Amino acid sequence: MSGWYELSKSSNDQFKFVLKAGNGEVILTSELYTGKSGAMNGIESVQTNSPIEARYAKEVAKNDKPYFNLKAANHQIIGTSQMYSSTAARDNGIKSVMENGKTTTIKDLT
């Protein structure tokens, strides 16, 4: 089963999306958007940029946990991963976003 996007509305009336793998695990989380159209544009940007390996910035948090950001061509962060236990796990997360990010399935929970 391939992945999907879930679009949701936060308690302060802002919008965000997550990308889920086929097993239902969240593999990428967006920033908050003030409008639904901004979040939809963010999903479109992930669909465009997720197959491009150069768009992934491999990072390490202050607690030494590896994670990654997916960036657009203008270097703006589109989405952020979870914190991983190892760099190998992070790299597998990137592969999962590269594979699942192209999906056109969007579950609108707003």
Curated annotation (Swiss-Prot):
This is UPF0339 protein SO_3888. It comes from Shewanella oneidensis (strain ATCC 700550 / JCM 31522 / CIP 106686 / LMG 19005 / NCIMB 14063 / MR-1). Disulfide bonds: none annotated. Coiled coil: none annotated. InterPro entries: DUF1508, UPF0339_domain, YegP-like_sf. Belongs to the UPF0339 family. Duplicated subfamily. Keywords: Repeat. It comes from the Bacteria. Sequence repeats lie at residues 10-58, 61-109.
